[in-house]
């Protein structure tokens, strides 16, 4: 058992001074002021620190390479993240359930000493009867409740709507990106012919209106079916406006933003790690809209999008993985844009709610997983010199508890322990008719 005592507990709703007792089963056993120390219980002093739920990263693309997974898991822990939801695909012709089994086997082996919990979005690149059957299998047997796909890419609108509709009937959520598509592909081809490539071509072919219209179209298709939808990453005012309009109509829309799009400027033609990733970096005028979307709750969560653009020693990298917490704290909380409670909502609670693992994750209450981030709110501002753009961060991860065990510490030796797969149950069977009724009411308004 582990008693975390003397800190200020911060949840998405409130802050208060209480102790937290973590049980041997990896769950929170008790909370309250001045808890007694059980016999044989270890004590972790949280004096002067904020105690928050461990971070939930709702969008990573780390991939299946076991060496890379094993190397990045400790980086995630050191950044305050205890749970990731990884995008999982497979070669065409490989069944969805088989692809999930391959992925789970590799990740379970790779993180056995890394301590980060993991779950999956299944990536869909085409839609037919086999895919529909695979969707049913993974939702029923594999703890999957979300599917990630591109709107406007290889799949036409009929296929995209087919996926959304089928997912809805299964009690699953579709997560859509809408940054590429035929418009962006057409523009990119013309830029390639003109000899314009790399970062400049990405920005020009996926301009703000392209992203905004794509996000609006994805939301519209889900709305016509009465389905909830998750969109992102979001990087422009146009996209924020589309999300805001839909939510004000009563549509169930959640959205994510990458920290890079909050602080890094995409002006110029410098080639940088991840410059071919979508969405591209934007000019500084877009930052205010994204911060406004976060502060108002229209953009509910931050994600790292961590994938092939670095994160390991010796690699050039974007700051989203190592700096997800510090960037939001420095430019959000310290700058007065966000509260500490907002910070918790955006780094853990809202993602856990959106993907149906709350309150197991993203909460501090009896019965929740004992995943805790002990944060020094007064940690000095410093530059992430190893990351592109050398952004400034502040605050500091002092300890990370996962499953009731100190998995990372900046001040003492610890053993991370093995990470676990997190089953995400599908939403209730009554969700589809309720949301469809709500969508019809929104459409009438």
Predicted segments, located by residue:
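N-terminal metal-binding scaffold of metallo-dependent hydrolase/deaminase domains
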Residues: 1-38
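Histidine-centered divalent metal-coordination motifs
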Residues: 49, 59-63, 177, 233, ...
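Alpha-helical scaffold segments that flank or form the walls of functional sites
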Residues: 49-50, 65-120, 125-145, 161-169, ...
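Histidine/acidic residue-rich metal-binding segments in metalloenzymes
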Residues: 130-302
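His/Asp/Glu-enriched, well-ordered alpha-helical/loop segment
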Residues: 196-226, 271, 292-301, 305-377
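C-terminal cap of metal-dependent C-N hydrolases
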Residues: 366-423
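Intein/HINT protein-splicing elements and their conserved insertion hotspots or analogous self-processing inserts
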Residues: 410-445
């Amino acid at each position: 058992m582990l008693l975390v005592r003397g800190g200020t507990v911060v949840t998405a709703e409130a802050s208060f001074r209480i102790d937290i007792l973590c049980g041997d089963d990896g769950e929170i056993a008790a909370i309250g002021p001045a808890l007694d120390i059980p016999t044989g219980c270890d004590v972790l002093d949280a004096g002067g620190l904020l105690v928050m739920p461990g971070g939930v990263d709702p969008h990573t693309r780390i991939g299946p390479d076991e060496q890379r997974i094993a190397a990045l898991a400790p980086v995630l822990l050191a950044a305050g993240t205890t749970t990731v939801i990884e995008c999982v695909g497979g070669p065409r012709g490989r069944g969805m359930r088989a692809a999930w089994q391959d992925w789970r086997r590799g990740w379970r082996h790779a993180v056995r000493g890394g301590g980060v919990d993991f779950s999956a979005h299944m990536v869909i690149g085409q839609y037919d009867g086999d895919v529909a059957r695979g969707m049913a299998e993974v939702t029923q047997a594999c703890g999957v409740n979300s599917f990630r796909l591109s709107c406007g890419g290889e799949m036409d609108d009929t296929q995209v709507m087919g996926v959304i509709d089928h997912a809805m009937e299964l009690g699953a959520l579709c997560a859509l990106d809408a940054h590429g598509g035929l418009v962006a592909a057409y523009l990119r081809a013309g830029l390639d012919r003109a000899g314009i490539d790399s970062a400049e071509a990405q920005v020009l072919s996926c301009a703000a209106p392209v992203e905004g219209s794509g996000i609006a179209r994805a939301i519209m298709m889900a709305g016509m079916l009465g389905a909830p939808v998750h969109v992102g990453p979001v990087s422009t005012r146009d996209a924020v406006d589309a999300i805001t309009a839909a939510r004000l109509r009563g549509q169930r829309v959640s959205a994510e933003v990458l920290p890079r799009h909050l602080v890094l400027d995409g002006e110029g033609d410098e080639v940088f790690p991840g410059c071919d990733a979508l969405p591209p970096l934007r000019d500084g005028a877009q930052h205010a809209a994204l911060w406004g979307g976060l502060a108002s709750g229209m953009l509910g969560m931050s994600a790292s999008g961590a994938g092939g653009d670095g994160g390991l020693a010796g690699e050039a990298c974007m700051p989203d993985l190592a700096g997800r917490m510090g960037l939001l704290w420095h430019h959000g909380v310290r700058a007065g844009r966000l509260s500490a409670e907002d910070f918790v909502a955006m780094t853990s609670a809202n993602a856990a709610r959106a993907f149906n693992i709350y309150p197991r994750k993203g909460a501090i209450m009896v019965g929740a997983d004992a995943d805790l981030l002990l944060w020094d709110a007064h940690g000095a501002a410093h530059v992430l010199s190893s990351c592109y753009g050398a952004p400034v961060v502040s605050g500091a991860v002092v300890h990370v508890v996962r499953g009731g065990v100190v998995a990372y510490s900046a001040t003492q030796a610890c053993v991370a322990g093995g990470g676990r797969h997190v089953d995400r149950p599908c939403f209730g069977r009554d969700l589809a008719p309720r949301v469809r009724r709500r969508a019809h009411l929104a459409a009438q308004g």
